[in-house]
């Protein structure tokens, strides 16, 4: 019998730059069990805002995205707003930050961390 394995496509894009920066931050903390949680909450000037936090625990209903040895966690409520989005890390003259490019956002704020859907 031949087993067929089907790889499930990732619900969002976690770029190499973002994964590299997350790994660097985890290494600085000296806690290899840390994972980066990205979430959406109410607030900001456009209705919703993005947030990032490090956690060790994966919740039962979390979606995980693994890249280059690091794990991104997304809760179900946030996932509905982040499907198809790209999580990136940019280092520029304006500063260094994680950036979310979200095709579901109908408007975004100038700060880049607030949006409406």
Swiss-Prot record:
Belongs to the HesB/IscA family. Homodimer. This is Putative iron-sulfur cluster insertion protein ErpA. Required for insertion of 4Fe-4S clusters. It comes from the Bacteria. One of its GO terms (biological process) is iron-sulfur cluster assembly. Its cofactor is iron-sulfur cluster. One of its GO terms (molecular function) is iron ion binding. InterPro entries: FeS_biogenesis (IPR000361), FeS_cluster_insertion (IPR016092), FeS_cluster_insertion_CS (IPR017870), FeS_cluster_insertion_RrpA (IPR023063), HesB-like_dom_sf (IPR035903). Gene3D superfamilies: HesB-like domain. The gene is erpA.
């Amino acid at each position: 019998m031949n087993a067929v394995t089907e790889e499930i496509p990732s619900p969002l894009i976690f770029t190499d730059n973002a994964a590299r920066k997350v790994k660097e931050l985890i290494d600085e903390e000296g806690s290899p069990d840390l994972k980066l949680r990205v979430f959406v909450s109410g607030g900001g000037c456009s209705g919703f805002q993005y947030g990032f936090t490090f956690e060790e625990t994966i919740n039962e209903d979390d979606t995980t995205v693994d890249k280059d040895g690091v794990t991104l966690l997304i809760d179900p409520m946030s996932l509905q707003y982040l499907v198809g989005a790209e999580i990136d890390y940019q280092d520029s003259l304006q500063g260094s930050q994680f950036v979310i490019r979200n095709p579901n956002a109908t408007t975004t704020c100038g700060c880049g961390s607030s949006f409406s859907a």
